[in-house]
Amino acid sequence: KNYWAHVDSSAYSRQMQYYYDTFGFSKIGSVYGDEIVCAIPDYTSVAEENGFTIVGYKLEREAFADEDEYYNRLESIYRRMVREDGVDAYILNTDVIPSVEKAAELMKIFYDANIPVVAQVGSAYVKGGAAMMIVDPRDAVGTGPFVSNIIGSVFNGSVPEDLEQEYVSSPFLTLNLDVADEIGYKPSFEMLIACEKIICSE
């Protein structure tokens, strides 16, 4: 009873739901190393509820002898997604491509086919042109006051286990307009208003 932890069990479900509501895709591609880290169960649940398909490939970097071999395999999967699987969106999952520059290079495969790429985590991917959009499920601006209120309650005598643990973050949306323009995507006025950050070269 002396422990407390912040939880947000539906963060990635809400994220995928937002992406689906925005793009209305029928098949979204996903390459992942670890199902739990990449929130595959959460995403799959949303897919089943909404009737779209996740075209998933499991690929562990540690299984490859060198980086070049890994990225060559990754590139071949991406090309297969576009040419054979018929994906109409792609989600860039956690830790699949640590380098933003490399991610931007490989995501051109999707952009050349006018397929939007969204990110699971890391607004740097949006800033670097690797992803068009991210709805960050972790809102530090909102979570901070929530946690500080909990700490204050504990200092004032409350028992940690009796305090609220779940905080549902507001979506933190970052959009790259240059990428959107490249693939011919026109964001709505409502989306632009909802953005916390808009990346644009002009």
Give each language-model segment a name.
Residues 34-37, 61-62, 95-99, 123-127, ...:
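Solvent-exposed loop/turn segments at secondary-structure junctions
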Residues 1, 106-130:
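Venus flytrap/periplasmic-binding-protein-like
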Residues 29-32, 81-99, 118-120:
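Periplasmic-binding protein-like
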Residues 153-202:
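Hinge/cleft segment of the Venus flytrap/periplasmic-binding protein
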Residues 2, 25-27, 50-55, 85-90, ...:
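Loop/turn elements at helix/coil->beta-strand transitions in domains of secreted/extracellular proteins
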Residues 47-71:
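Short beta-strand elements in bilobed, periplasmic/extracellular small-molecule ligand-binding domains
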Residues 1-18, 129-145:
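Short beta-strand elements at the ligand-binding edges of bilobed clamshell
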Residues 4-54, 165-179:
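An alpha-beta-alpha
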